[in-house]
Amino acid sequence: MKVLFINPPIYDFSAFDLWLKPLGFLKIIDLFKKNGFEIFYFDFMDRNHKFYNNIKVKKGKFGCGKYFFKEVEKPEIYRNIPRKYKRFGLPVEVFIEFLKDIKNPDFIFITTGMTYWVLGIKEVVEIIKKFYSRVPVIIGGIYASFCYDDAKNLEVDYIFRGKDIFKFSYDFSSRFGIDIKIPDILKPYWGVYEKLDYLVVKTSYGCPFSCWYCGIKQFEPEYKKRDFDEVVEEIIENAEKFKIEDIAFYDDALLFNFDEQLYKILEKVKRYNKNLRFHTPNGIHPKFIKKEVAYILKEANFKTIRLSLETIEKNRIEESGYKVNFSEFENSIKYLIYAGFTKEEIGVYILAGLPGQMPNEVINTINILRNYPVKIKIAEYSPIPGTVDFKIAQKLYPDLPISNPLFQNNS
């Protein structure tokens, strides 16, 4: 049987490939491959597609870079925003040429990213239905999980919510009458790409913390470490296969239980490959950066450190379960600098646009951070359905259409 997997284009005001890959989707592909299905894959966001050979798009550092884009008409809800709205990713024509070679797939899977990227999902569904009107279409991912009611308006046959692979296997088997067995080891199947500039990895699932703005608990309710030997094998195998130097960690709590997890992974990896560079695009917890941890990260060749400070406002920190207090943050910076990290390598995330947040809170945080050798990274708040902050926003701003996925765009 044949299965077609699709990662849609992005419709947004801006988009940049900052180690962006559909990691969970690649695990679903691995599941079907190990169950004997023939796999076809199209990633609109693949910057290594041959289409890019004929255009000039600037590449960034460490495998990151810009996407091909085309300006498009803004949806009505954005009409007063004085910015250009764009469609990022491979052109529709490239996708259609690809589909012409895929005869009668048995199932079609579409992953969904940020809730406000919904227009890319709609585009793909509409095209797919023209080509394969009777083929079952299944969607999953972030938008499908957090905006389930909105997703029901799409012309799809099944919407999977969350990341429970056992539930997915049961639901799929029950609905379509095909037994899907869960293998002992399930990991992202990178073989769908001919070339990669970087690898993204998770050493754990879920998060032991419960920040008010974060939706991870709805996706992965329990924190669980992966087998570190399995992670090491995944890194070494794919780094060698694709000649990769850059590895980005997707963990929500990368340094949690450092000695028992990440430290062991780094120690084993360097025995096989000492030329890798590591990056932490997700904010890490400053309180876990002790002196020895900072030196280990430096020795392991971490090039991108992103710390989550979020705010210096004490009441918000105490109420909302955020990742750090300021003294822990100061210590983490001290240890990182002592270990040899530079200002260019240390970025600090602060949140802006939280429900009820006044501009002075953000300004004060920025002014204080200017006294430290770090790059300030403002993370604009995006309301995630089901989170505590989303419910607060609904109460504070009852007249705003917060439940509309397009309105959840932080731009």
Functional labels for PLM-detected ranges:
Residues 185-343, 347, 352, 367:
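Radical SAM [4Fe-4S] cluster-binding motif and immediate context
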Residues 148-154, 292-293, 355-370:
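Catalytic cores of alpha/beta
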Residues 37, 133, 302, 341, ...:
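Short phosphate-binding/catalytic loops that engage adenosine nucleotides
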Residues 143, 252-255, 283, 353, ...:
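Short, solvent-exposed turn/loop segments enriched in Gly/Ser/Thr/Pro and often Arg
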Residues 155-156, 298-304, 372-375:
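Glycine-enriched alpha-helix->loop->beta-strand junction motifs that scaffold or abut catalytic
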Residues 2-244:
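Acidic, low-complexity intrinsically disordered segments
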Residues 3, 39, 108, 137, ...:
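Hydrophobic/aromatic residues located in beta-strands of well-ordered beta-sheets
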Residues 4-11, 15, 20, 42-52, ...:
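C-terminal accessory regions of radical SAM enzymes
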